[in-house]
Amino acid sequence: MVQQKALHGPQSFSEILFSLRFIVCQFLGEGAATWDEFKKTSGVVLTTDYSGIGSAEIACAFIVEALRHLGHLSTTQAASFVLCWRACELVGSCRSVLADHHDAFAPKHIMGDLLDRLPACVKTSLSSLYKKHLNAFTKAWAHAAGAKKGNKSLQSSESSKGAKAKAKSKAKAKAKTAHAQPRKKASPGPLRPNLSRADLVKTHGQASLQEAWAEVQKKAPIQTAHCFRCDGMCAVPPPSDVRANHRYINVSGNTCVPWSMLGSKFGWLHECTIVMLAWLWSLVKALPECIIEECTPRFDWEAFQDLLSKWYVVQSLVYSPCQMGIPVKRQRRYTICIRKDTLVFSIPWSITTMQDNFWRSLDITARVFFRAPKSYLKLV
């Protein structure tokens, strides 16, 4: 099958701003059944975690604007189509930016620490559990590293012995003894099979993840937390009357430090996994129709999928804005989780679908983001 040529991407900064119109238009063709489901509702209730400065909320504003521009929402409908119920961000300066949002896409509630959703006894248990598994990994890695060092020393020693043996071969050939010398024993093999750090991180990390997930489910998550916008205790999940006749979607971007090339590479053994489990368990109890999770490409989405398999269909893709014609080389893994008992999102989520319907040629460079005159840019 011959692959169709990608459509031309944005040609200017203004076209980048409105490129979501193209994406929404394509989606309404490929995902018509999904849009038909949405039209039966009053709209979307959105919550975000690891919220940063509100990128998901801003993206929602662009999507709704595109729907209005394309005639699928009236101006009145667009004003209330998305209700941003809650954001959650640990960093105070980011919360200040979130609090400055005052349009229709400003979160009604702004919360802080995701760990506030776990009872104190669960946090204590998880902390002890992760220390146990981290210590086990540390010992295993020290043993493996020591074995490798021993093997290298042994190989070096054998190599040195071999060189000396060659140097003395002539003398040994001439030497005659009355009795044969006893044969030396063969040198021992490796002290243990070679194990990489990545192998040990994966083995111990997945063991700790499964044990921690079982532990976190022993207690219900806390349903309220301090709200920095209201200065009081507010509901973490949107209440049933707010969700009525709406589709509930959560968009979050987990901490990338354990998974990125420049991060710790501790995977599930990193302490922030406890935070991730607090986030995930609170969502499982609320059961949004869709969870969209963003992280770096090395994120272990298959283990993540195993945690959610009882409730969600989970799929994952890696791509960057460059594939949509936007000159931002920021490859990320996007994992989408659709609730099994609703399955309201019928659009096929595959690399082929994305390529056929959303990929566009990259026709501009990052210079498009500069505001300097073109005459100056030519000199750069």
Q: Language-model segments: which ranges?
A:
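Active-site loop signature of alpha/beta-hydrolase-fold enzymes
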Residues: A56, S93, R117, V257-W259
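Short, conserved SAM-binding/catalytic segment
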Residues: A99-K108
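S-adenosyl-L-methionine
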Residues: M1-S96
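Class I S-adenosyl-L-methionine
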Residues: A120-A165, A173-Y248, G253-V380
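Conserved phosphate-binding loops in nucleotide/dinucleotide-binding enzymes
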Residues: L114
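Conserved residues in the N-terminal Rossmann fold of short-chain dehydrogenase/reductase
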Residues: M111
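Alpha-helical structural signal in soluble globular domains
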Residues: A59-A66, H101, S282, D306-W311
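Intrinsically disordered, low-complexity, charge-biased tails
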Residues: A78-A79, K168-K174
